[in-house]
Amino acid sequence: MQHLVDTSNFSDAQIVQLLHDAKTFKAQRPPQLLRDKLIITLFFEASTRTRSSFEVAAKRLGAAVVHLDPSRSSTKKGESLEDTFANLCAMDPDGVIIRHEENEAPGILADMQMTSVINAGAGNYAHPTQALLDLFTLMEHFEGNIEGKTIAIVGDIISSRVASSGIRLLRRMGMNVILVAPEPFMPQSDLPQYENLEDVLDKVDVIMSLRAQLERHASPIFDDYNEYARHYCITEERLGDRNILILHPGPVMRNIDISDEILEDPRCKVLTQVKNGVYMRMAILKLLLLDSNN
Protein backbone atom coordinates (compact mmCIF):
# COMPACT_ATOMS: atom_id res chain seq x y z
CA MET A 1 0.00 0.00 0.00
CA GLN A 2 1.46 3.36 -1.05
CA HIS A 3 0.37 6.86 -0.12
CA LEU A 4 0.96 10.38 -1.43
CA VAL A 5 1.47 12.63 1.58
CA ASP A 6 4.22 14.61 -0.13
CA THR A 7 6.26 14.16 -3.29
CA SER A 8 9.05 12.54 -1.27
CA ASN A 9 6.81 9.44 -1.16
CA PHE A 10 7.63 8.89 -4.84
CA SER A 11 10.98 7.70 -6.15
CA ASP A 12 12.62 9.39 -9.12
CA ALA A 13 11.59 6.41 -11.25
CA GLN A 14 7.98 6.80 -10.15
CA ILE A 15 8.00 10.50 -11.00
CA VAL A 16 9.32 9.66 -14.47
CA GLN A 17 6.50 7.12 -14.79
CA LEU A 18 3.93 9.71 -13.70
CA LEU A 19 5.15 12.17 -16.33
CA HIS A 20 5.02 9.46 -19.00
CA ASP A 21 1.52 8.34 -18.02
CA ALA A 22 0.17 11.90 -17.82
CA LYS A 23 1.53 12.61 -21.30
CA THR A 24 -0.04 9.39 -22.61
CA PHE A 25 -3.41 10.15 -21.03
CA LYS A 26 -3.35 13.65 -22.51
CA ALA A 27 -2.65 12.29 -25.99
CA GLN A 28 -5.45 9.73 -26.01
CA ARG A 29 -8.50 8.80 -23.96
CA PRO A 30 -7.42 5.93 -21.69
CA PRO A 31 -9.18 2.64 -21.06
CA GLN A 32 -11.14 2.36 -17.82
CA LEU A 33 -8.21 1.06 -15.83
CA LEU A 34 -9.88 1.68 -12.45
CA ARG A 35 -13.40 0.51 -13.29
CA ASP A 36 -13.59 -1.71 -10.18
CA LYS A 37 -12.16 0.91 -7.79
CA LEU A 38 -13.96 3.10 -5.25
CA ILE A 39 -12.52 6.43 -4.11
CA ILE A 40 -13.78 8.65 -1.28
CA THR A 41 -13.04 12.40 -1.27
CA LEU A 42 -12.94 14.23 2.05
CA PHE A 43 -12.41 17.99 1.75
CA PHE A 44 -12.33 19.98 5.00
CA GLU A 45 -11.42 23.15 3.07
CA ALA A 46 -12.93 24.75 -0.01
CA SER A 47 -11.71 23.59 -3.40
CA THR A 48 -12.68 24.23 -7.02
CA ARG A 49 -9.82 22.92 -9.12
CA THR A 50 -8.39 20.11 -6.98
CA ARG A 51 -11.63 18.39 -6.03
CA SER A 52 -13.16 18.69 -9.51
CA SER A 53 -9.90 17.61 -11.13
CA PHE A 54 -9.63 14.50 -8.97
CA GLU A 55 -13.25 13.55 -9.62
CA VAL A 56 -12.86 14.00 -13.38
CA ALA A 57 -9.58 12.05 -13.30
CA ALA A 58 -11.12 9.17 -11.36
CA LYS A 59 -14.22 8.97 -13.53
CA ARG A 60 -12.21 9.06 -16.75
CA LEU A 61 -10.39 5.99 -15.47
CA GLY A 62 -13.69 4.32 -14.61
CA ALA A 63 -13.55 4.60 -10.81
CA ALA A 64 -16.58 5.34 -8.67
CA VAL A 65 -16.27 8.47 -6.52
CA VAL A 66 -18.12 9.22 -3.27
CA HIS A 67 -17.78 12.68 -1.71
CA LEU A 68 -18.25 13.13 2.03
CA ASP A 69 -19.10 16.71 3.00
CA PRO A 70 -17.41 17.26 6.40
CA SER A 71 -19.86 20.06 7.22
CA ARG A 72 -22.63 17.44 7.22
CA SER A 73 -20.63 14.61 8.73
CA SER A 74 -20.25 13.34 12.28
CA THR A 75 -17.10 15.45 12.70
CA LYS A 76 -19.61 18.21 13.50
CA LYS A 77 -20.80 16.03 16.39
CA GLY A 78 -17.32 15.65 17.82
CA GLU A 79 -16.12 12.55 15.97
CA SER A 80 -12.34 12.63 15.52
CA LEU A 81 -10.69 12.69 12.12
CA GLU A 82 -9.15 9.28 12.81
CA ASP A 83 -12.52 7.75 13.72
CA THR A 84 -14.18 9.27 10.67
CA PHE A 85 -11.43 7.82 8.49
CA ALA A 86 -11.64 4.39 10.16
CA ASN A 87 -15.38 4.26 9.59
CA LEU A 88 -14.96 5.19 5.93
CA CYS A 89 -12.28 2.53 5.55
CA ALA A 90 -14.68 -0.06 6.99
CA MET A 91 -16.59 0.42 3.71
CA ASP A 92 -13.53 -0.87 1.80
CA PRO A 93 -12.62 2.08 -0.44
CA ASP A 94 -9.49 1.72 -2.54
CA GLY A 95 -8.32 5.21 -1.66
CA VAL A 96 -9.23 8.35 0.27
CA ILE A 97 -8.38 11.82 -1.03
CA ILE A 98 -8.20 14.38 1.77
CA ARG A 99 -7.78 18.14 2.09
CA HIS A 100 -7.32 19.46 5.61
CA GLU A 101 -6.24 22.63 7.39
CA GLU A 102 -3.72 20.76 9.56
CA ASN A 103 -0.28 19.98 8.10
CA GLU A 104 -0.11 16.56 9.74
CA ALA A 105 -3.60 15.25 8.90
CA PRO A 106 -2.83 13.22 5.73
CA GLY A 107 0.25 11.68 7.34
CA ILE A 108 -1.69 10.64 10.43
CA LEU A 109 -4.24 8.84 8.25
CA ALA A 110 -1.57 7.25 6.07
CA ASP A 111 0.14 5.87 9.19
CA MET A 112 -3.06 4.01 10.04
CA GLN A 113 -2.39 1.82 6.95
CA MET A 114 -6.08 1.22 6.22
CA THR A 115 -6.23 2.40 2.60
CA SER A 116 -4.19 4.54 0.21
CA VAL A 117 -4.24 8.19 1.29
CA ILE A 118 -3.78 11.02 -1.19
CA ASN A 119 -3.04 14.51 0.12
CA ALA A 120 -5.08 17.10 -1.79
CA GLY A 121 -3.62 19.95 0.25
CA ALA A 122 -2.72 20.18 3.94
CA GLY A 123 -2.14 23.35 5.94
CA ASN A 124 0.68 25.44 4.55
CA TYR A 125 3.08 22.52 4.18
CA ALA A 126 2.13 20.27 1.29
CA HIS A 127 0.09 20.15 -1.91
CA PRO A 128 1.92 17.37 -3.75
CA THR A 129 -0.46 16.90 -6.67
CA GLN A 130 -0.18 20.61 -7.51
CA ALA A 131 3.60 20.33 -7.47
CA LEU A 132 3.46 17.31 -9.78
CA LEU A 133 1.07 18.92 -12.25
CA ASP A 134 3.26 22.03 -12.29
CA LEU A 135 6.26 19.81 -13.00
CA PHE A 136 4.34 18.19 -15.87
CA THR A 137 3.45 21.63 -17.28
CA LEU A 138 7.08 22.77 -17.08
CA MET A 139 8.45 19.58 -18.63
CA GLU A 140 5.92 19.87 -21.44
CA HIS A 141 6.83 23.50 -22.13
CA PHE A 142 10.60 22.99 -21.95
CA GLU A 143 10.46 19.75 -23.98
CA GLY A 144 11.53 17.49 -21.13
CA ASN A 145 14.50 19.45 -19.82
CA ILE A 146 14.10 21.81 -16.86
CA GLU A 147 17.49 21.23 -15.26
CA GLY A 148 19.22 24.57 -14.75
CA LYS A 149 16.10 26.60 -15.46
CA THR A 150 15.22 29.27 -12.89
CA ILE A 151 11.78 29.82 -11.38
CA ALA A 152 10.79 32.77 -9.20
CA ILE A 153 7.99 32.11 -6.72
CA VAL A 154 6.25 35.42 -6.06
CA GLY A 155 3.80 36.40 -3.34
CA ASP A 156 2.61 35.04 -0.02
CA ILE A 157 5.12 32.21 0.13
CA ILE A 158 4.99 31.61 3.88
CA SER A 159 1.25 30.82 3.74
CA SER A 160 1.44 28.66 0.62
CA ARG A 161 1.41 24.86 0.61
CA VAL A 162 1.83 25.10 -3.17
CA ALA A 163 5.11 26.92 -2.68
CA SER A 164 6.29 24.46 -0.02
CA SER A 165 5.71 21.36 -2.15
CA GLY A 166 6.84 23.08 -5.33
CA ILE A 167 10.14 24.21 -3.85
CA ARG A 168 10.99 20.71 -2.67
CA LEU A 169 10.06 18.98 -5.93
CA LEU A 170 11.48 21.51 -8.40
CA ARG A 171 14.82 21.69 -6.58
CA ARG A 172 14.93 17.90 -6.60
CA MET A 173 14.38 17.95 -10.37
CA GLY A 174 17.27 20.35 -10.95
CA MET A 175 15.61 23.76 -11.14
CA ASN A 176 16.96 26.88 -9.49
CA VAL A 177 14.35 28.46 -7.21
CA ILE A 178 14.33 32.07 -6.02
CA LEU A 179 11.78 33.72 -3.74
CA VAL A 180 10.22 37.15 -4.22
CA ALA A 181 8.06 38.61 -1.45
CA PRO A 182 7.89 41.30 1.21
CA GLU A 183 9.68 40.22 4.37
CA PRO A 184 6.53 39.12 6.31
CA PHE A 185 5.55 36.84 3.40
CA MET A 186 8.99 35.21 3.24
CA PRO A 187 9.68 31.85 4.93
CA GLN A 188 12.99 30.95 6.52
CA SER A 189 15.00 29.49 3.65
CA ASP A 190 18.47 29.11 2.22
CA LEU A 191 17.14 30.10 -1.21
CA PRO A 192 17.93 33.48 -2.81
CA GLN A 193 15.41 36.06 -1.60
CA TYR A 194 14.30 39.35 -3.12
CA GLU A 195 11.74 41.95 -2.10
CA ASN A 196 11.70 43.73 -5.46
CA LEU A 197 10.11 41.85 -8.38
CA GLU A 198 11.95 43.97 -10.93
CA ASP A 199 15.28 42.69 -9.59
CA VAL A 200 14.63 39.14 -10.85
CA LEU A 201 12.93 39.61 -14.22
CA ASP A 202 16.17 39.21 -16.18
CA LYS A 203 17.25 36.18 -14.12
CA VAL A 204 14.28 33.82 -14.54
CA ASP A 205 12.66 31.48 -17.04
CA VAL A 206 9.44 31.04 -15.06
CA ILE A 207 7.39 33.05 -12.58
CA MET A 208 4.93 31.29 -10.31
CA SER A 209 2.58 33.89 -8.87
CA LEU A 210 0.72 33.05 -5.65
CA ARG A 211 -2.50 34.44 -4.21
CA ALA A 212 -1.91 37.14 -1.65
CA GLN A 213 -3.53 35.84 1.54
CA LEU A 214 -3.64 39.05 3.55
CA GLU A 215 -6.32 37.52 5.78
CA ARG A 216 -3.78 35.02 7.16
CA HIS A 217 -1.55 37.75 8.60
CA ALA A 218 -2.32 39.25 12.00
CA SER A 219 -0.71 42.65 11.41
CA PRO A 220 -1.37 44.67 8.25
CA ILE A 221 1.42 44.47 5.69
CA PHE A 222 -0.34 46.46 2.98
CA ASP A 223 -3.26 48.86 3.32
CA ASP A 224 -5.20 46.81 0.77
CA TYR A 225 -4.79 44.42 -2.16
CA ASN A 226 -4.29 47.29 -4.59
CA GLU A 227 -1.18 48.39 -2.71
CA TYR A 228 0.12 44.80 -2.88
CA ALA A 229 -0.59 44.75 -6.63
CA ARG A 230 1.49 47.86 -7.22
CA HIS A 231 4.54 45.90 -6.06
CA TYR A 232 3.86 42.30 -7.09
CA CYS A 233 1.18 42.04 -9.80
CA ILE A 234 2.48 40.38 -12.97
CA THR A 235 1.68 42.95 -15.65
CA GLU A 236 2.43 43.55 -19.30
CA GLU A 237 4.41 46.64 -18.32
CA ARG A 238 6.62 44.61 -15.98
CA LEU A 239 7.18 41.64 -18.29
CA GLY A 240 7.74 43.55 -21.50
CA ASP A 241 8.83 41.17 -24.25
CA ARG A 242 10.70 38.80 -21.93
CA ASN A 243 10.06 35.15 -22.72
CA ILE A 244 9.01 34.20 -19.18
CA LEU A 245 6.48 31.45 -18.52
CA ILE A 246 3.74 32.49 -16.06
CA LEU A 247 2.13 29.98 -13.69
CA HIS A 248 -0.44 30.32 -10.91
CA PRO A 249 -2.08 27.53 -8.86
CA GLY A 250 -5.39 29.39 -8.60
CA PRO A 251 -7.61 30.96 -7.60
CA VAL A 252 -6.15 33.98 -9.41
CA MET A 253 -7.03 37.39 -8.06
CA ARG A 254 -7.26 39.34 -11.31
CA ASN A 255 -5.22 42.53 -11.41
CA ILE A 256 -3.85 41.70 -7.95
CA ASP A 257 -1.76 38.60 -8.68
CA ILE A 258 -1.79 38.76 -12.49
CA SER A 259 -3.24 41.41 -14.79
CA ASP A 260 -6.10 40.75 -17.22
CA GLU A 261 -3.73 41.26 -20.15
CA ILE A 262 -1.19 38.70 -18.94
CA LEU A 263 -3.92 36.14 -18.22
CA GLU A 264 -4.75 36.32 -21.95
CA ASP A 265 -1.08 36.28 -22.98
CA PRO A 266 0.29 33.04 -24.52
CA ARG A 267 3.11 33.11 -21.97
CA CYS A 268 0.53 32.48 -19.24
CA LYS A 269 -0.22 28.78 -18.69
CA VAL A 270 -2.82 28.97 -15.91
CA LEU A 271 -5.49 27.06 -17.83
CA THR A 272 -2.88 24.62 -19.13
CA GLN A 273 -2.07 23.85 -15.50
CA VAL A 274 -5.74 23.08 -14.84
CA LYS A 275 -5.94 20.84 -17.90
CA ASN A 276 -2.70 19.08 -17.01
CA GLY A 277 -3.95 18.60 -13.47
CA VAL A 278 -6.54 16.10 -14.67
CA TYR A 279 -3.96 14.02 -16.54
CA MET A 280 -1.40 14.11 -13.74
CA ARG A 281 -4.03 13.09 -11.19
CA MET A 282 -5.08 10.25 -13.49
CA ALA A 283 -1.45 9.12 -13.50
CA ILE A 284 -1.27 9.38 -9.69
CA LEU A 285 -4.45 7.33 -9.23
CA LYS A 286 -3.15 4.69 -11.64
CA LEU A 287 0.16 4.49 -9.78
CA LEU A 288 -1.33 4.27 -6.29
CA LEU A 289 -4.43 2.18 -6.91
CA LEU A 290 -3.26 -0.11 -9.70
CA ASP A 291 0.49 -0.26 -10.27
CA SER A 292 1.47 -0.27 -6.57
CA ASN A 293 -0.84 -3.21 -5.91
CA ASN A 294 0.54 -5.38 -8.72
From Swiss-Prot:
Keywords recorded for this protein, A-Z: Pyrimidine biosynthesis, Transferase
Binding sites annotated in the UniProt record for L-aspartate: K77, R161, R211
Chain sites annotated for binding carbamoyl phosphate: R49, T50, R99, H127, Q130, G250, P251
Entry superkingdom: Bacteria
Family annotation (InterPro entries): Asp/Orn_carbamoyltranf_P-bd, Asp/Orn_carbamoylTrfase, Asp/Orn_carbamoylTrfase_sf, Asp_carbamoyltransf, Asp_carbamoyltransf_Asp/Orn-bd
GO cellular component terms, A-Z: cytosol
PROSITE patterns the UniProt entry points to: CARBAMOYLTRANSFERASE
Gene Ontology biological process terms from the UniProt entry: 'de novo' pyrimidine nucleobase biosynthetic process; 'de novo' UMP biosynthetic process; amino acid metabolic process
GO molecular function annotations of the record: amino acid binding; aspartate carbamoyltransferase activity
Pathway per the UniProt entry: Pyrimidine metabolism; UMP biosynthesis via de novo pathway; (S)-dihydroorotate from bicarbonate: step 2/3
Catalytic activity: carbamoyl phosphate + L-aspartate = N-carbamoyl-L-aspartate + phosphate + H(+)
Enzyme Commission designation: 2.1.3.2
HAMAP family: Asp_carb_tr (MF_00001)
Family to which the UniProt record says this protein belongs: Belongs to the aspartate/ornithine carbamoyltransferase superfamily. ATCase family.
Subunit structure: Heterododecamer (2C3:3R2) of six catalytic PyrB chains organized as two trimers (C3), and six regulatory PyrI chains organized as three dimers (R2).
Protein function: Catalyzes the condensation of carbamoyl phosphate and aspartate to form carbamoyl aspartate and inorganic phosphate, the committed step in the de novo pyrimidine nucleotide biosynthesis pathway.
PANTHER family, alphabetized: ASPARTATE CARBAMOYLTRANSFERASE, ORNITHINE CARBAMOYLTRANSFERASE, MITOCHONDRIAL
UniProt name for this protein: Aspartate carbamoyltransferase catalytic subunit
Species, as recorded: Sulfurovum sp. (strain NBC37-1)
Gene name as annotated: pyrB
